[in-house]
């Protein structure tokens, strides 16, 4: 409350070109609608110079304070304090739970699981798992070529002398009914999917070497490389498919592959695609055992051969090559020629039919996986059969390349050890990064006599393989952030299963090193985040109630993401 009587007595005449004096005299003019006890706050806040003079006027002419607040000021303060309490409470809760998860929860997941007992709780021997895959015609152990009938023409059968030098030649093949969960033990069959586009020799070789060096039995893991089209990276002398094939020691039983047709996730003329399947082993140049390896090269239809980027259909299509294959294997559905060729060659390489694979590790071609990472992720899956997806910590490989990479180090650390760790407490990690994540292909039922499809469930495959993308919402989900949308689909389809973060599993990847590249990446990420959080808001079965629920956390994340770049400093308006 200000008393301007002393001011008017001192300055009897108006001061020219003084906005503060003008406001005061307008307030006390006879033509004004204000009375002596009216609120003149709005008059002073309209003009910037008058607003800046408020502290000085309060110091010289303050007569007292109003002993009550107006309704507007009271509601503004109420909303402010409630928001402050909720936000600070959420931040502190996230931090405390993340610390607990780092020292207690995650260690339980990463610990070595107990060996599977041969007897159930009732004392009865567990039944042998049923063979839920009817092998296609010719997919028997008598077919030593391991390829489809239409691809056997012109293949040279190796002589007995040369066959002795082939990798894993002494592995005895097992029929699906000859192994039990006890025989598999704590080393389930895992396929490591590596999606490539335009990476060079150094990047792909580093990724394959890191997967080969993981502390996991070589006869229980399969490196599955998908080259997305006939692409040659900038500054590279070899195309990406040639690089992938050159790093593999081919299995002479298969000869020269034949292009096989499959249905891609594109539409129109690109709805059909063809791919070559190379099979063999990867041998790390630094030593170690050879690992079974399959390279799928998407070469395109014959009419694409003369064009640029023949066979290129995107990363989602590369993922669908594997996911669709295992869906057909799990559900015993009719197979495409490409699926059939994959079935034969994987069967011959691994010694078991592909239905034995339970998990898939998805990595990018520029990611280096630490040796214990695969084991830690597999342990988490075995310790809790409700887990359908898990990710590890992604660290920056080129953190000292520029100031742009350096500023991302702390952000990556917080996003994993606070955000993902907090979400993992409730089993609801909303985003498993596409560069390093593991998904469960199928889960064992309690009786060990059947399986529950997880990532290959028909609902997930149908939505993730949409070919007609028209709306802006669909484009942001399927074209800009397909990796995050896959996590959203998993949570929406299986709200009572878990998605976790395993900090013990570590990988290194390269991040954008220029500001232009970083802004382009973050624009895609923000668009994808907003649209995926909107999808998660519709999932009503997430754990918790009201403010103590994952749905409320998702809402807060959505509001924060939308307001992050539109927020501005609040006006210093006195109330």
Model-derived regions: residue spans:
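Membrane-interface recognition of transmembrane alpha-helix starts
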Residues: 69-87, 543-564
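Conserved small/polar residues in nucleotide/adenosyl-binding loops
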Residues: 565-572
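A short, sequence-level motif marking secondary-structure junctions
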Residues: 4-8, 299-301, 566
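Non-transmembrane catalytic domains and loops of membrane-associated enzymes and transporters
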Residues: 123, 127-559
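B-type heme-binding environments
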Residues: 1-153, 157-159
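Generic hydrophobic/packing signal
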Residues: 21-38, 45-71, 191, 231, ...
């Amino acid at each position: 409350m200000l008393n301007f009587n002393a001011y008017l007595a001192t300055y009897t005449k108006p001061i020219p070109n003084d906005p503060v004096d003008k406001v005061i005299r307008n307030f006390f003019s006879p033509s004004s609608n204000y009375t002596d006890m009216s609120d003149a706050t709005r008059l002073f806040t309209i003009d910037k110079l008058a607003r800046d003079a408020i502290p000085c006027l309060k110091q010289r002419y303050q007569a007292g304070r109003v002993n009550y607040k107006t309704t507007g000021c009271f509601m503004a303060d109420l909303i402010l304090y409630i928001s402050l309490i909720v936000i600070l409470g959420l931040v502190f809760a996230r931090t405390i739970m993340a610390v607990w998860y780092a020292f207690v929860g995650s260690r339980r997941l990463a610990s070595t699981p107990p060996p599977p007992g041969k007897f159930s709780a009732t004392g009865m021997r567990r039944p042998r798992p049923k063979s839920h895959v009817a092998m296609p015609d010719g997919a028997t152990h008598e077919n030593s070529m391991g390829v489809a009938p239409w691809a056997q023409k012109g293949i040279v059968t190796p002589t007995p002398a040369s066959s002795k030098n082939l990798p894993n030649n002494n592995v005895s093949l097992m029929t699906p009914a000859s192994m039990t969960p006890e025989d598999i033990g704590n080393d389930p069959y895992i396929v490591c999917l590596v999606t490539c586009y335009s990476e060079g020799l150094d990047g792909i070789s580093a990724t394959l070497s890191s997967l080969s060096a993981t502390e996991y039995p070589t006869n229980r893991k399969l490196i599955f490389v998908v080259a997305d089209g006939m692409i040659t990276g900038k500054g590279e002398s070899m195309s990406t498919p040639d690089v992938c094939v050159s790093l593999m020691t081919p299995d002479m039983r298969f000869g020269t592959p034949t292009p096989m047709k499959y249905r891609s996730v594109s539409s129109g003329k690109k709805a059909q695609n063809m791919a070559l399947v190379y099979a063999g082993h990867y041998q790390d140049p630094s030593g170690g055992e050879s690992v079974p390896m399959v390279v799928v090269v998407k070469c395109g239809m014959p009419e694409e051969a003369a064009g640029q980027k023949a066979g290129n259909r995107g990363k989602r299509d590369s993922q669908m090559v594997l996911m669709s294959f295992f869906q057909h294997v799990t559900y015993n559905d009719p197979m495409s020629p490409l699926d059939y060729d994959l079935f034969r060659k994987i069967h011959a390489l691994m010694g078991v039919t592909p239905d034995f694979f339970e998990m898939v590790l998805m990595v990018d071609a520029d990611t280096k996986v630490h040796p214990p990472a695969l084991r830690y992720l597999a342990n988490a899956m075995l310790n809790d059969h409700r887990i359908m997806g898990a990710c590890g910590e992604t660290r920056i490989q080129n953190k000292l390349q520029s100031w742009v990479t350096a500023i991302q180090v702390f952000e990556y650390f917080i996003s994993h050890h606070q955000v993902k760790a907090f979400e993992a407490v409730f089993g609801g990690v909303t985003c498993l990064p596409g560069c390093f994540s593991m998904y469960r292909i199928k889960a064992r039922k309690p009786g060990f006599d059947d399986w529950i499809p997880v990532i290959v469930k028909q609902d997930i495959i149908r939505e993730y393989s949409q070919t007609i993308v028209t709306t802006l919402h669909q484009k942001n989900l399927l074209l800009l952030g397909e990796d995050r949308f896959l996590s959203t689909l998993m949570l929406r389809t299986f709200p009572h299963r878990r998605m976790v973060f395993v900090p013990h599993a570590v990988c290194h990847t390269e991040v954008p090193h220029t500001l232009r590249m970083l802004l382009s990446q973050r624009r895609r990420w923000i668009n994808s985040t907003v649209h995926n959080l909107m999808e998660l808001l519709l999932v009503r079965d997430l754990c918790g109630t009201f403010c103590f629920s994952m749905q409320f956390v998702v809402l807060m994340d959505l509001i924060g993401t939308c307001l992050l770049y539109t927020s501005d400093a609040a006006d210093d308006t006195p109330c």
